[in-house]
Amino acid sequence: MADMHSLFIAFVLGVVEGLTEFLPVSSTGHMIIVGEWLGFTGDKAKTFEVIIQLGSILAVVVMFWRRLFGLIGIHFGGKPVEHEGKTTGHLKLGHILLAMIPAVVLGLLFHDVIKSLFAPKNVMYALVVGGFLLLAAEWLKPKKPSAEGLDDITYRQAFMIGCFQCLALWPGFSRSGSTIAGGMLVGVNRYAAAEFSFILAVPMMIGASGLDLYKSLHFLTMGDLPMFAVGFATAFVVALIAIKTFLTLIKRISFVPFAIYRFIVAGVVYMVFM
């Protein structure tokens, strides 16, 4: 049976996961850092992180459920999803599948290598490099995006965003950061790039989390269920709030503050763990 200390750890990590999963600051990096501070490491901690990520994924499903079902041809009320963009295009399942291919291929080929990178030093470097990518996206993006809305995104842009997503295989880089920045660099409006990133996260994270969970099921016990339930529920609620807030925020501010934050966190990692 989980004690109060375990439930407290679950709550704290649930908050961290929910807050950072869809912000361009790296949830994995923060989970590793906070986990080290709380003394919650090892195989059980990794399994716990996988499960609470599913809570964050559920938040995206709740936020974008009409769009997600629309991708597979299911339209509730007989009406298609409201068109977002200036062209006559539509976001289709093919866009998502194309964006998934690069990271899926590399992830399967180098799964064990990627898992070996989960250490504070590697996270520190990823935070810095990812910060520079955010700055590059703001400074080098086209003055007038070719894709103003989600439905304007082309197959080529979707695939290129998928290539940028491969950077997120480096722990600490940030999946949302790499895909949103990549989207901006290939001509997608910041807001539309964020929406595409969140929708792309659903199949990507379910696949990655499902594989990790399958490989670590033997670390679970019935006594861990309360702890995992608290972490899952907390991550879901916090992620829901974080996504809504983030989508509102990026209409008004650039990613420069997020880049600066990443540099600060990298400095903290250096001082504490190096």
UniProtKB/Swiss-Prot annotation:
<keyword id="KW-0961">Cell wall biogenesis/degradation</keyword>
<feature type="transmembrane region" description="Helical">
    <location>
        <begin position="191"/>
        <end position="211"/>
    </location>
</feature>
<keyword id="KW-0378">Hydrolase</keyword>
<keyword id="KW-1133">Transmembrane helix</keyword>
<keyword id="KW-0573">Peptidoglycan synthesis</keyword>
<keyword id="KW-0133">Cell shape</keyword>
<feature type="transmembrane region" description="Helical">
    <location>
        <begin position="94"/>
        <end position="114"/>
    </location>
</feature>
<keyword id="KW-0997">Cell inner membrane</keyword>
<protein>
    <recommendedName>
        <fullName>Undecaprenyl-diphosphatase</fullName>
        <ecNumber>3.6.1.27</ecNumber>
    </recommendedName>
</protein>
<feature type="transmembrane region" description="Helical">
    <location>
        <begin position="117"/>
        <end position="137"/>
    </location>
</feature>
<feature type="transmembrane region" description="Helical">
    <location>
        <begin position="6"/>
        <end position="26"/>
    </location>
</feature>
<keyword id="KW-0812">Transmembrane</keyword>
<feature type="transmembrane region" description="Helical">
    <location>
        <begin position="253"/>
        <end position="273"/>
    </location>
</feature>
<dbReference type="GO" id="GO:0046677">
    <property type="term" value="P:response to antibiotic"/>
</dbReference>
<keyword id="KW-0046">Antibiotic resistance</keyword>
<dbReference type="GO" id="GO:0008360">
    <property type="term" value="P:regulation of cell shape"/>
</dbReference>
<feature type="transmembrane region" description="Helical">
    <location>
        <begin position="223"/>
        <end position="243"/>
    </location>
</feature>
<comment type="similarity">
    <text>Belongs to the UppP family.</text>
</comment>
<feature type="transmembrane region" description="Helical">
    <location>
        <begin position="155"/>
        <end position="174"/>
    </location>
</feature>
<dbReference type="GO" id="GO:0050380">
    <property type="term" value="F:undecaprenyl-diphosphatase activity"/>
</dbReference>
<dbReference type="GO" id="GO:0071555">
    <property type="term" value="P:cell wall organization"/>
</dbReference>
<dbReference type="Pfam" id="PF02673">
    <property type="entry name" value="BacA"/>
</dbReference>
<dbReference type="GO" id="GO:0005886">
    <property type="term" value="C:plasma membrane"/>
</dbReference>
<comment type="function">
    <text>Catalyzes the dephosphorylation of undecaprenyl diphosphate (UPP). Confers resistance to bacitracin.</text>
</comment>
<dbReference type="InterPro" id="IPR003824">
    <property type="entry name" value="UppP"/>
</dbReference>
<keyword id="KW-0472">Membrane</keyword>
<keyword id="KW-1003">Cell membrane</keyword>
<feature type="transmembrane region" description="Helical">
    <location>
        <begin position="45"/>
        <end position="65"/>
    </location>
</feature>
<dbReference type="GO" id="GO:0009252">
    <property type="term" value="P:peptidoglycan biosynthetic process"/>
</dbReference>
